[in-house]
Amino acid sequence: MDRFSWCTGLLDIDETLVIQQRGVRLSDGEEKTKFDSGTLLLTTHRLIWRDQKNHDFCIAFPLSQIVFTEEQAGGIGKSAKIVVHLHPATPNKEPGPYQTSRYSYVKLSFREHGQIEFQRRLAEELTQRRWERLSASASPSMQMNKGPQTGRIKAVGIVGIERKLEEKRKETDKNISEAFEDLSKLMEKAKEMVELSKSIATKIKDKQGDISEDETIRFKSYLLSMGIANPVTRETHGSGTHYHMQLAKQLATMLQAPLEERGGIMSLTEVYCLVNRARGMELLSPEDLVNACKMLESLKLPIRLRVFDSGVMVIEHQSHNEEEMVASALETVSEKGSLTSEEFAKIVGMSVLLAKERLLLAENMGHLCRDDSVEGLRFYPNLFLTQS
């Protein structure tokens, strides 16, 4: 710790910040210090530690003092550390918190993680040794300002830093303004697209103009794929039962094609994602989706909500045949000898959740039996049923 010197924490003109990390504690070798919680800054020239509560409390040492670094992994109740081995303190060193130390290394404890990236960037700086090149390029101008104008160097440094900070602030303000402008334009375009979709939907409905049947189907396909079809909302259909009835009708129309592609059954989670993706900005809450799905069967719509014994909720076609589904599962398992739900899902092309429910249903009906071991749940054909 006797290599550290007091500093202001401000960067020199030719110095650049590389990375910083909060929640770092300094240790003098194996001994704890009062530098318990601060921000560690790595620049092209120095390693700076600044107290998180009192920013004027800063210490630093030059990177040229470092011999090598090593990492110490964390454990239970212990933070990961970077051990920095240092050269002996130079005789002309500026005053610091420690005059002497019996250790030739310091430990940097990272309480809030980030040590891996910090160590990588520190190793890069030690390899590139940018402080030597930057100091060499800055030395001619420093020589010009020596002698009676010594005080001017400090003034130029502070003014330069303030100017840089002001330029960065202006650039940030400009970027924020441009971002808000882009967001406003995007929202305006989104409104235009919604209005356009409503107009097209109305024309399709009224069959105005020379729109053929094929063009009508194509328009509907485009609108659905773009996710901007005219959705049922509380603003347009009120609230309560009427809203959920209209929503159920729209769901029945929209889910026909996806259900056919997925073998006539989908988990409610899949349905929720699919519906909200298609509705665009008019997002649907989980409660409204469940309430609408509960009305599907009573409204005599072609799809229905089904709840398995495990509590898993799915949407399926009214024509979905349970016996055929179980027979298909039995045939697949018999061909392979035995299957897990993951293997079955991969073969039939459905989610693992639905695959497991299908196998459990076949088991409940006596067609399959299980082997539940440390390797997982595996299903086998019920030989007692088939061989008898």
UniProtKB/Swiss-Prot annotation:
It is found in: Cytoplasm; Endosome. Gene3D superfamilies: 6.10.140.260, Pleckstrin-homology domain (PH domain)/Phosphotyrosine-binding domain (PTB) (2.30.29.30), Winged helix-like DNA-binding domain superfamily/Winged helix DNA-binding domain (1.10.10.10). It comes from the Eukaryota. GO terms for molecular function: mRNA 3'-UTR binding; phosphatidylinositol-3-phosphate binding; ubiquitin binding. Signal peptide: none annotated. PROSITE patterns: GLUE. InterPro entries: GLUE_dom, PH-like_dom_sf, Snf8/Vps36, Vps36, WH-like_DNA-bd_sf, WH_DNA-bd_sf. Residues 162-198 form a coiled coil. Component of the ESCRT-II complex (endosomal sorting complex required for transport II), which is required for multivesicular body (MVB) formation and sorting of endosomal cargo proteins into MVBs. The MVB pathway mediates delivery of transmembrane proteins into the lumen of the lysosome for degradation. The ESCRT-II complex is probably involved in the recruitment of the ESCRT-III complex. This is Vacuolar protein-sorting-associated protein 36. It comes from Xenopus laevis (African clawed frog).
